[in-house]
A protein has these predicted regions:
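Bacterial N-terminal signal peptides that target proteins for export
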Residues: 1-8
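Acidic/polar, low-complexity intrinsically disordered N-terminal segments immediately downstream
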Residues: 4, 23-103, 107, 265-310
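C-terminal motif of bacterial Sec signal peptides marking the signal peptidase cleavage site
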Residues: 17-21
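Auxiliary, metal-adjacent structural segments of Zn-dependent hydrolase domains
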Residues: 27, 84-150
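Second-shell loop/turn segments in exported
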Residues: 72-80, 152, 164-172, 176, ...
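Active-site recognition of the HExxH zinc-binding catalytic motif
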Residues: 144, 158-171, 175-196, 239
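Acidic, glycine-rich loop-and-strand cores that form catalytic or ligand-binding grooves
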Residues: 178-220
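Metalloprotease/metallohydrolase-associated module, dominated by Zn2+-dependent proteases
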Residues: 206-310
Length: 310
């Protein structure tokens, strides 16, 4: 979900001083009242240095920084052990996907990846009933929520059922994180090099700009959208079409097409071809090759030990 958030904070320092006397011999304390101590780097920090900072110039922030969160929501810090797990998963299911696609060349992902990934332990719940799983700020920072729900012992990424509940067990890494990561990365790429305006006309007049949250994914398919969120507006429609296609197996994608019916399927396929052409002509990315890498890695994720950094 691409929600631009600008957070400004003002800090007002107030001091009340009572002067009861002054002695010329009193010395001012030369020490600053502000702590200059820095947090000592642990094993995880050193791992992040080698796996995120040096190769990609990404700051992976797992510690809770109050100023980095939206003050309109009550959220909690990410669990330390689960932060290590998501760091390994982001590397395996996102960064290395594009490295595989580029035959090991990290230039592409290093150039366009967001510079900050911030983890939050809980989700953000909006007043209209939607849940914020991830946000991106102008392509520079990605916030990932709900980290504390990760199952360390059963890593699972669903690729076959687009209508499986994200709250169903085992915890679905694709539904909760990596669909969103690919969605937000699509926004970064289209904001760098825009997609053809013709896409905006495919579902013109059919978007649910104010009530998309009430549109179910199955209902959306019949209207020519891959998800309820895609029905909100054309930029989200484009990114959702991309991220849904590349994170679903052919069988999973076919379930959406079958649900859509003849009219809805024709619209969805028209959008898919527009997305496919954009990535091919603009970025030299074969959508089906990217998808095959994502599906392969999604099925391999069950073999990852999330309790160690090895």
């Amino acid at each position: 979900m691409n929600k631009l958030k600008y957070l400004g904070m003002g800090l007002l320092l107030m001091a009340a001083t009572t002067f009861t006397g002054c002695n010329e011999e009193d010395d001012l304390n030369p020490n600053s009242i502000f702590s200059e101590e820095t947090t000592e780097k642990n094993e995880f920090d050193l791992w992040l240095l080698e796996n995120y900072v040096k190769p990609y110039n990404i700051s992976f922030q797992y510690r809770y920084f109050d100023k980095e969160t939206d003050q309109n929501y009550n959220v909690i810090p990410a669990d330390f052990e689960k932060s290590k797990a998501i760091a390994k998963l982001v590397q395996f299911l996102w960064l290395d996907v594009y490295n595989d696609l580029m035959d090991g060349d990290k230039t592409f992902i290093k150039t366009y990846t967001p510079r900050v990934i911030q983890l939050i332990g809980s989700y953000q719940y909006n007043s209209q009933g939607s849940i914020v799983m991830g946000t991106a700020e102008q392509g520079m920072k990605v916030m990932l929520y709900g980290i504390n729900d990760i199952d360390l012992d059963v890593p699972y990424a669903n690729v076959d059922d687009p209508y499986r509940s994200q709250f169903e067990k085992p915890f679905d890494l694709n539904a909760n994180y990596f669909h969103t990561m690919h969605h937000e990365f699509c926004h970064v790429l289209t904001q760098t090099k825009d997609y053809p305006k013709d896409f905006q006309t495919i579902s013109a007049g059919a978007y649910h700009s104010t009530d998309w949250v009430n549109v179910t994914d199955k209902q959306a398919a019949k209207e020519g959208f891959v998800s309820g969120y895609a029905s909100g507006e054309y930029n989200e429609d484009f990114a959702e079409t991309f991220s849904t296609y590349v994170t679903l197996s052919p069988a999973g994608w076919q379930k959406i097409i079958d649900q859509a019916g003849e009219e809805g399927a024709a619209i969805i396929n028209q959008k898919l071809e527009a997305v496919r052409e954009y990535f091919s002509s603009t970025w030299n990315i074969d959508l089906d090759e990217l998808r095959s890498i994502i599906i392969r890695r999604s099925t391999e994720v069950e073999n990852i030990d999330l309790r160690t950094l090895n």
